Amino acid sequence: MNRPLLALLAAPLLASPLSAQPAVSPGDRQVHEEMLVIDTHLDIAMRFDSGEWDFAERHWFEWDGSQVDLPRMIEGGLDGGFFVIYTAQGELTPAAYADARTAALVRAAAIRRVIGENRDRMGLALTADDAERLHREGKRIAFISIENSWPLGEDLSLLQTFHRLGVRMAGPVHSRNNQLADSTTDTPRWNGLSPLGRQWVAEMNRLGMLIDGSHSSDAVFDQLIELSRVPIVLSHSGPRAIYDHRRNLDDARMRRLARAGGVMFMNTIFLAPDDRSPERSAIGDRQENWHALNPAERRRLLADKAALDAQRPFTTATFDMFMRSMLHAIAVMGVDHVGLGADWDGGGGVQGMEDIRFLPRISERLRLEGFSDRDIAKIMGGNLLRVMRQAQAFAARRS
């Protein structure tokens, strides 16, 4: 961005609470930096397809609505995460499956392209050992996952194709039922997994890929726990006891997940009502097109967003609500079964933690709550690496 334009746009941001670096004590910041911090659900890859959005450039949440980029990963001490191949659910027809498969492959290629363009600062991780090696090298860690396995159609051999492309985690379903499973936000069709969905579980285990139960119905969750030979995860979910929404999990199932060795990675959505109005969607569409706007259009967008924020914020959830959710999960499941999966760039973020720069606040708060640095390190990344190793060790024994 040229300097005159930067100066022109900087003024509105000087008054923003996001302009200053999050206030965390030097000691807490150092502890956070020394940990391996991984988020299991980064939807920023939705911006990669066109090639016009530069992941290496410093962006601002207030400007384009984005929450993750390489500079902010450094600022927030986020060492890596799962970059998501997301496909919105469509029809269960051969033509729709083909279109979805193409879209998913394009997204996978875009993620690999971005990793390659920034190979001096980040690398593709296929295993837990890869993640630890990249961390030692001072590089950011890029895992790849699939949110919604609808693009597989009825051909489960495509799971191996995506595995070869680097995918190491996948969920069967998203916001609507598909050929594999019932969604938690749809009317039951299969009463859990479909027959093909049960085969999907076996193939995921065979390949050593993590099974992600987020967005799955309660019945699907129960069947995933029953059928999987290794622990499953919820890549971006939360406790229903904190906010009663179908996307969240009840305490009994949280305990069952922990007994099975699984991990719930804590979401920042479904903590409180948020703004899903047409006006908010329109602002979001304009923000996603930030790179193409001229200075006058950018000023107008910032003014319109400020007016809408003053009328109703993008979310009523706060950082304290998020921490209450995480602390409840720890109390129910234990520190070995909780992690971080905030759904950045997929609707995530709360007041006081609007983007990844604020992640050190979590470590600071956990220390204030009396958790040891060892336990915090489990939550920040250790628990993820454990379940990855378990899934891949099972696959290796079966090969």
Predicted regions and their residues:
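Bacterial N-terminal signal peptides that target proteins for export
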Residues: 1-7
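Bacterial N-terminal signal peptides
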Residues: 7-17
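Histidine-centered catalytic micro-motifs
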Residues: 37-44, 216, 234-237
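Alpha-helix-loop-beta-strand connector modules within alpha/beta enzyme cores
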Residues: 190-205, 224-234
